[in-house]
Amino acid sequence: MLNFLKKQNVENKAEKLNEIYGKLKEYTHFDELKEERKEQLRNIVKKYGYLNYPHLKVLEELSAAETLCALEIKWENNGVFKDGKFTFKNDEVSPLARNHVKNGDWLKKEGHDIKLINLAALGNGNYSETPGKFFDWVKQILILPTGDLKRNIFDTTIYLIPFQERNFGCAYLPTSSSVSKELNDKNIEDNLHFNVKEQVQLFIELAQLAGHPVIYDVLPQAGRFEKIVLANPNIARWYDINYLIDKISQKLDEITPELEKDFAKEDIEVTKTLYKQMLKSGAGDFSAKYKEIYEKIDLILEDYKKEISEELSKKDEQEKLVKKVKEVISKALNTKNKHLTEDDINDKVIMELTNNGLWTVPGGAWCSAGVPAFQKMSECGSYPLFKHYDYEGKDVTKLANLDCQTPYYFVCLENGKFNNKVIEIFIKHLEKFQEDYNFDGFRIDHVDHIVDKFSQKDGTPISYRAPWKILSELNKHMKNKIPYFATLAEYMLWDKYYKEYHEDMHFDVLWGNDIPCQSDKTPENIMLDNQELTNYNVSLKDKNYLSFLKTYNNQDGEFEAFDRYPTQLGENGAIFKWFKYKFLSGGKFANRPVLYVDGDETFTKGEVEKTVGSEISMRRNKNYHFFNRFDSVNRLAKSFEAVTEGEAQIITQEDDGYVCWLISKETLKTALLVVANYQAPTEYFTKENENGESITELKYGQDIFDKSISIPGDYKAVAEYVFNGEDFERTDFANKETDLKFNKLYPSQFKIFELQR
């Protein structure tokens, strides 16, 4: 009886959304739209399944009311909207739930698109840096390409990078679980009485009802003083910097006799005084006379600094430090014996902790092992500085870029024992994120190198990175709770640890290495990647196959460490890169989705990194001709069963750039033939100079001439698909051809022919 009453009291989500939607229509003056304009927009969406506009165009040309009007067709197509009303079951907001999906295979499917989106970047950056707001986000839903559920291809997955409050403006340095206030739409707040979190939740709900799964970028570490850390101090390692400074100062006094062997006593005392000052403030100038002594002190103390930092990181010391941290926090908040939540934390807590010399132990370099060794405070004493070492004890501080992050205290590095309470908090934290926003999956950041020599020895963790067993527990937990929940690992395939990430950690898709290896990804090498995946999957006992992303672009492409992104290839080169990933199908055992970034569709250059590092709108390139080509290639690929269900085979690839490949499916009488010049107009290649140093060289593609191909097997060419400026158009041949000749192919030119048996 009680269960029945509970069910009776559960809020009907469709009814609630209809109430909200009515207010949105009233606020946007929906009823004032002209019928002619309504019909125009709806007809486009009926034709394509989405509005085939670039984001800048929809920002500039569509009102909020027009956006809602056109979106109604997407909702109708998904069976959740009829006669002006939403109608769906409470547990079927996600398109995966509505279609009764039982595993993560939907994310792996050939032909499926994943689009990386930053909510802040969706505003009109050509006009203002003001971050995107609610209707900017909703306009993105309208223009997202659809899939083909008859072939199990879901509509484009929205992959959201972190939308939380940021430190230093960076999306990957969260300060709390709360949505950034910069995203708040004051008009929506005033008219709907929705706070910024509710605005994001509504956006995700509308996107899922329009057919788009939504996944979120999550971190296996926290921001330096993120609120989850301050509410649960035991989940991080802590250093008492004042204690470390005192210990180093004492040791400095002890090594005076050793210094007196080489230097005058008076000079040593002056240098020691300056050194102790620098431990606290980091600032100081040395004449050449004292600099030599300073460097000698640094050399002598290096091992000691490592030793005392390691000692302070051990469990017994950490328990004492956590107790001290809790006392400081309790005093700052004027609370006692209270279980804290993020809502209890304020800026005063951070001030009191740092005033007491209490800082979280940071991450480090991608190859760091052990714990970082405290060196001194920064100039003006605003934050601590550390040295980082790898598993061989080599100094890798120059590679360290994670000193602003706080790794979870998952494991005691001194003995390899796991901290189960920390693991439980971590998993519950991400479970709560999923519940709050109804995410369909996670992309888990920073999980490269977690099973190699840099992060574990004989199976025991040795670095700050999340141990693989924790990720395994997280994935199992989420998939047991939500059968269709899919996870994507940021693993770049180094050393081929496929089994470890797939079978042991339960990831569905791996990030791959397409961005750092952009210049190596010729059609033949992409096919070798497909074959690598096939070889792994055919060996599996069950049909839970692994997938690798085909990455046209991601947020790393513009970073200095990689410096590889599509616009470097020129317009034709970028389109051909997109075409390659769409038309080099891997077959049954190598289904691979394609990832791209908001802005790629219009050949936007150098803006992704800016919006990841700063909470601003993206400045977009207004190249609508490029958009038409980009969009048309995607639609064309999804229109062919041979592409989404079949397999590509390289017929020939020559060093001058000439390549031909066949795309076929055994049960079909039709196939496709692609002929291309795979050279890009411009492309960066890495090579070694005469000193053995790695350098980047820009190369220019060349035209190729007088090529021919004999149609393979019993196929004959019957038509060519030619881009007409807006779409690809089929042009039938007068006669069926068995041979094709090409007088000239310019760099990145490609031709698509239909073959029949």
Placement of each model-derived feature along the sequence:
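Hydrophobic faces of well-ordered beta-strands that scaffold small-molecule active sites
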Residues: 115-117, 158-160, 214-216, 442, ...
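N-terminal structural segment of carbohydrate-active enzymes
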Residues: 2-213, 221, 227-232, 237-424, ...
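C-terminal beta-strand-rich structural cap/linker in extracellular carbohydrate-active enzymes
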Residues: 732-757
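Aromatic- and carboxylate-enriched substrate-binding clefts and catalytic-loop regions
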Residues: 205, 216, 221-250, 315, ...
